[in-house]
Amino acid sequence: MGRLRPEEISSILKGAITDYESRVRTEEVGQVLEVGDGIARVHGLSNVMYQEMVEFEDARGEKVIGLALNLEEDNVGVIIAGDDRYILEGSTVRRTGRLASVPVGQGVLGRVINALGQPIDGRGEIQAEETRPVEIIAPGIIRRKDVDTPLQTGIKAIDSMIPIGRGQRELIIGDRKTGKTALAVDTIINQHDQNVKCIYVAVGQKDSAVAGVVAQLEEYGAMEYTTVINASASQPAPLQYLAPYAGCAIGEYFMHRGEDALVIYDDLSKHAVAYRQMMLLLRRPPGREAYPGDIFYLHSRLLERAARMSEEYGGGSLTALPIIETKAGDISAYIPTNVISITDGQIFLDLDLFNANQRPAIDVGLSVSRVGSSAQIKAMKKVAGTLKLDLSQYRELASFAQFGSDLDKATQETLARGERLTALLKQRERDPMPVEEQVAVIFGGTQGLLREVEPDDVPDWEAQLREYLRSSHEDLLKDIREKKELTDETAERLREAIERFNEGFEPARSEVKVETRPQEEEGEEG
């Protein structure tokens, strides 16, 4: 190898200096001033963003995620989304530059994850297409369209009288142990042929209750299109706070792809309690019932993200079914009234009805769907149009009838009809019904074709009628299913079919009557 001349060395050095790029990696690092109860006060992160994820290095050398929520002049209040036992005064905290986000896509379906999107089902890492921020601004008015497509729950009482549309927010509210979680799980099971992706968010529930819900979803094949997010009572309040937003972000991914998604928040009462705990520890001023001043905004910004997108923006939808637990049936308390005012209607479950074996225990008088009727199929609207009024009249007359026995014939007929309609709306748990069968069954009830059937025999009548129509009149059911209408000709054919069935109907009196919805319920403690 020849020697380099001095001028060559000089030119090589000049070239190296010219091509040199300085790469300086800067990190903003802070120190923990105090820590306790899942909250840390941190000094030194002067440029941290609101809701930015930060990384603690604990005494074991492990990394723990936190979320910056209080941005004060000389320190930052951080909620710790993990084990804070080994985070000590003086521990190092680093900015990540990322807002809280979760993995989304087909890879999360069939999985059980925590509020940070980490798998907790022991089935390995999640193969996600991308991540989405858990907090995002809801779509504006221009990007939305009217709710015009039904979300079939498979529950007769809901699909007929309190219909839910895709993109709607319908509150399920009631005392503990009244069947709230059962309604939600049945709705998920009914989506098996509806092409709706489901997200079930459990906040503050027992792990055993959530495991029970997952087992039921697996048994009915519903986990294939469902993601379960578990932020149980044993997990830190920050994870319970984040869980609904994480579930919403996963649902939004499908909505923005033009698909339909359903997200269930079980329940937002415990979500509000977790938020109150965090805010009190961060020393934010308490208001009514010690909740912070922005408790309404906590839920409104979550539920406003449910939408039916216009065709120009993909035409997808995100339907929200939040659950609220009341105390002694008091729906006028702070959190229940907040969420009632945010949502597009509510399904109120009554403990007295539940104990009287009317299950699902829906109080028709207090339940309403403000936008769902425009999404209801025409066939259901036609057969169930007077159902709510008939039941209201029956309940009113029944309360007066107990005081006297001298009732005129018209009153007796109204009571008898109401008794049969009430029995007709009972439904077993985990037995969602296709909408065409619902139309046929309710048609029989509202058209007086149950007159000769004893109220106790109505469940047998319904089960046998469904079997009879499936075996002998499949064309009739197919006609209702595909056209979604009940023309005069179809109605006449249906009437004739039910009348023929009634002639040979024999109640199976030896069988045990409908033990409807015996509820091990609620992923909540009830």
UniProtKB/Swiss-Prot annotation:
It catalyses: ATP + H2O + 4 H(+)(in) = ADP + phosphate + 5 H(+)(out). It is a peripheral membrane protein. It is found in: Cell membrane. The keyword Calcium does not apply. Residues 505-526 are annotated as: Disordered. The record marks 367 as: Required for activity. The keyword Cell membrane applies. SUPFAM superfamilies: C-terminal domain of alpha and beta subunits of F1 ATP synthase, N-terminal domain of alpha and beta subunits of F1 ATP synthase, P-loop containing nucleoside triphosphate hydrolases. HAMAP family: ATP_synth_alpha_bact. ATP binds at residues 174-181. F-type ATPases have 2 components, CF(1) - the catalytic core - and CF(0) - the membrane proton channel. CF(1) has five subunits: alpha(3), beta(3), gamma(1), delta(1), epsilon(1). CF(0) has three main subunits: a(1), b(2) and c(9-12). The alpha and beta chains form an alternating ring which encloses part of the gamma chain. CF(1) is attached to CF(0) by a central stalk formed by the gamma and epsilon chains, while a peripheral stalk is formed by the delta and b chains. Its main location: membrane. Produces ATP from ADP in the presence of a proton gradient across the membrane. The alpha chain is a regulatory subunit. GO terms for molecular function: ADP binding; ATP binding; proton-transporting ATP synthase activity, rotational mechanism. Its EC number is 7.1.2.2. Belongs to the ATPase alpha/beta chains family. This is ATP synthase subunit alpha. Keywords: ATP synthesis, ATP-binding, Cell membrane, CF(1), Hydrogen ion transport, Ion transport, Membrane, Nucleotide-binding, Translocase, Transport.
